[in-house]
Amino acid sequence: MLDPALLRQHPADLAERLRSTRGFSLDTAELESLESERKRIQVRTQELQSQRNSKSKAIGQAKAKGEDVAALMAEVAGFGDELKASEDALDAIRAKLEGIALGLPNLPAEGVPLGKDESENLEQSRWGTPRQFDFAVKDHVELGAPHGWLDGETAAKLSGARFTVLRGPVARLHRALAQFMLDLHVGEHGYEETNVPLLVNADSMRGTGQLPKFEDDLFQTEVGESRRYLIPTSEVPLTNIVREEIVDAERLPLRMTAHSMCFRAEAGSGGRDTRGMIRQHQFEKVELVTACAPEDSDAEHQRMTRCAEVVLEQLGLPYRKVLLCTGDMGFSAIKTYDLEVWLPSQNTYREISSCSNCGDFQARRMQARWRNPVSGKPELLHTLNGSGTAVGRAMIAVMENYQNADGSIDVPQVLRPYMGGIERIG
């Protein structure tokens, strides 16, 4: 959530910044009308509260003197009805204003390129040279499906489209990748392994920015009066660990990692990436989350992105690093780097990691704070999140980049200890 002071004091300036950087249209006329109405109702509510308190005090004094208080009691009762109506009206208009505030995207950091979509992202660097094959390259489906290792048909029978059953050595490769990533981030990068719930409440989804804007892309479940959401990323539970907390400065930065299932409805994906495992309703990811002091978030962003890069480098997978433009950034981010891995079958780079600095945007929604030792006062944290990396896409990249002419797949050196020493699949 953006600073409410921006909405109240500079709505026109904020609207222009949102329009020019995010392509977002803020109705300032509606906002100013609601804010004016809020002030009017709030003043009247405070007047009624003051009158009620004054009359209540007078009742106490009259009772102490043994005087008849019936008339005063009747006045207070009248105030009570009007006060309740005024308080309800104030709550309703505050809810409308909060709804507007919750729907506003974050403002990009200085230096983020202006642009309308991914075509205007800026490539920062490349690592590795895509392999030149002397045979016809197969995609991950052609490599896995003939052996039954990758089975979309059975998954469709069980669950519908955009699910996959993995078997045998490919299922083991998938598991090995997740274990390798976790061990790397915990053992070498200093993240704390954390096992988190896959079902979270609405407050958690609001805290990280999935609600209310992206509800259509979420799976949810209701039991009785209890509603829970399946997480689209473990960023949600990891980041919400600091919700409504005041963290001591000595504990910062908090660096957490989790391997989890992720669930996405892919409501806006249409017919994109329907083949294989590129875009699934259920997939696995190793997530990185950091909460830190504001002055450290830029450095933590660079560090987090580098941690994700190391995963790909140790796997020997060519990739490129891209700085996202304003039109391609996520809702909560002020700055985002994407890592895109080379897929030979598509002859292009595809996203495998996205690392974002969210500034104080999520922290304000969550009331996640730290105690500044200089001022001694609680201040908003900065939060960051990144994929370290998507497990399914890493498996696809390994299968395709390490394939042989006979359809077998070499196992990258760093994964062999997790594969029982197996050097080749197939």
UniProtKB/Swiss-Prot annotation:
Enzyme class, first EC level, given as a word: ligase
Keyword tags: Aminoacyl-tRNA synthetase, ATP-binding, Cytoplasm, Ligase, Nucleotide-binding, Protein biosynthesis
UniProt binding sites for L-serine: 233-235, 287, 387
GO terms for cellular component: cytoplasm
Pathway: Aminoacyl-tRNA biosynthesis; selenocysteinyl-tRNA(Sec) biosynthesis; L-seryl-tRNA(Sec) from L-serine and tRNA(Sec): step 1/1
Role this protein plays: Catalyzes the attachment of serine to tRNA(Ser). Is also able to aminoacylate tRNA(Sec) with serine, to form the misacylated tRNA L-seryl-tRNA(Sec), which will be further converted into selenocysteinyl-tRNA(Sec).
Family: Belongs to the class-II aminoacyl-tRNA synthetase family. Type-1 seryl-tRNA synthetase subfamily.
Domain comment (free text): Consists of two distinct domains, a catalytic core and a N-terminal extension that is involved in tRNA binding.
Name of this chain's protein: Serine--tRNA ligase
NCBIfam families named in the record: serS
Subunit structure: Homodimer. The tRNA molecule binds across the dimer.
Gene Ontology MF terms: ATP binding; serine-tRNA ligase activity
GO biological process: selenocysteine biosynthetic process; seryl-tRNA aminoacylation
UniProt organism field: Xanthomonas axonopodis pv. citri (strain 306)
UniProt binding sites for ATP: 264-266, 351-354
Record has Ligase as a keyword: yes
Entry's EC annotation: 6.1.1.11
Catalytic activity: tRNA(Ser) + L-serine + ATP = L-seryl-tRNA(Ser) + AMP + diphosphate + H(+); tRNA(Sec) + L-serine + ATP = L-seryl-tRNA(Sec) + AMP + diphosphate + H(+)
Compartment(s) of residence: Cytoplasm
Signal peptide residue numbers: none
Broad class of the protein's primary localization: cytoplasm
Pfam families: Seryl_tRNA_N, tRNA-synt_2b
InterPro entries referenced in this protein's UniProt entry, alphabetically: aa-tRNA-synt_IIb (IPR002314), aa-tRNA-synth_II (IPR006195), aa-tRNA-synth_II/BPL/LPL (IPR045864), Ser-tRNA-ligase_type_1 (IPR002317), Ser-tRNA-synth_1_N (IPR015866), SerRS_1_N_sf (IPR042103), SerRS_core (IPR033729), tRNA-bd_arm (IPR010978)
